[in-house]
Amino acid sequence: MRLKVAVLGSTRGTALQGILDEVAAGTLDVELVLVASDKQTAPILERASNYGIRAKFVDPSGLKRETYDGIVTDALREAGAELVLLIGYMRIVSPQFVETWHGRLLNVHPSLLPAFAGLMNQRVHEAVLAAGVSETGCTIHQVTEEVDGGPIVLQKRCSVLPDDTPETLKNRVQALEQAAFVDVLRKWSA
């Protein structure tokens, strides 16, 4: 039986593309059962819909974090999710959500954790360049109550080039994120 995977995302969901491509090619044996977002116009929803994956907007307006996460958990359970991936998800999940999905909740962070933990999106790449480090990458980690502090599942690395900008670095790291999620899903679905 194929592993049933759901994705939560708030942005473009670039890292999802690698998974979609591999599933469509028949080279990754998982079933994407749901892609949900807290942003109604998040491109990740269209990306999923284009592949026939159920896409759902869950409106967080006026809801406490715990209430919202409970609604999301209901949607994930209804979809039959066994593993949840956070891909560009710009919300901090509640302790109850972490407990409910313990061991089955993975996040991607655009740096080599623990370096640059707690930063999001473009700010990470700006900080990497400002720090003058020679390499960066991405980290897939289990989600715990400590932001970006869960056990590391996989890291992929790339060099920081002298002429890098935050955007060029982000593009290279996003390519690593796609490959990293595919690698992790291959191991988890074996």
What are these regions (language model features)?
Residues 1-190:
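One-carbon transfer enzymes
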